[in-house]
């Protein structure tokens, strides 16, 4: 069984974690993610991470399990755009983002 942690590792799928949030009971869910994996829409997840792709620096929003396994991701123009997208999916999430202290 995978270890459950509220804090992600420094890298997820070869991308450096910049910010992360735990989606707990106090956070809403809009009912739609509009993120499809293998032809099915991804539902509510317990963790989100905003990451910088190592080679390009592109911003990715990862939808993750409790153990930080990545289920799906979306690309964004900026960290702020990724946070705005996450807030549309999970109303009330904006105050829960934590800045990761990852080394470069």
Give the residues covered by each predicted segment.
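Short, exposed beta-strand "edge-strand" segments with a Pro/Gly-rich flavor and a Y/T-containing core
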Residues: 2-6, 71-77
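Intrinsically disordered, low-complexity segments enriched in proline/serine/threonine
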Residues: 10-11, 48, 93
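A short, charged, amphipathic alpha-helix used as a generic interaction element across diverse proteins
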Residues: 75-93
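Short, Lys/Arg-rich amphipathic alpha-helical interaction segments
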Residues: 93-104
């Amino acid at each position: 069984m995978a270890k459950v942690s509220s804090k992600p590792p420094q890298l997820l799928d070869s991308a450096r974690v910049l910010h992360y949030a735990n989606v707990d009971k106090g956070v809403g869910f809009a009912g739609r993610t509009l993120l499809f994996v293998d032809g099915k829409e991804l539902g509510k997840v317990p963790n989100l991470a905003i990451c910088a792709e190592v080679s390009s620096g592109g911003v990715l929003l990862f939808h993750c399990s409790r153990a930080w396994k990545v289920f799906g991701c979306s690309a964004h123009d900026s960290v702020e755009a990724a946070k705005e997208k996450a807030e549309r999916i999970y109303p009330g999430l904006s105050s829960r983002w934590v800045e990761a202290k990852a080394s470069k």
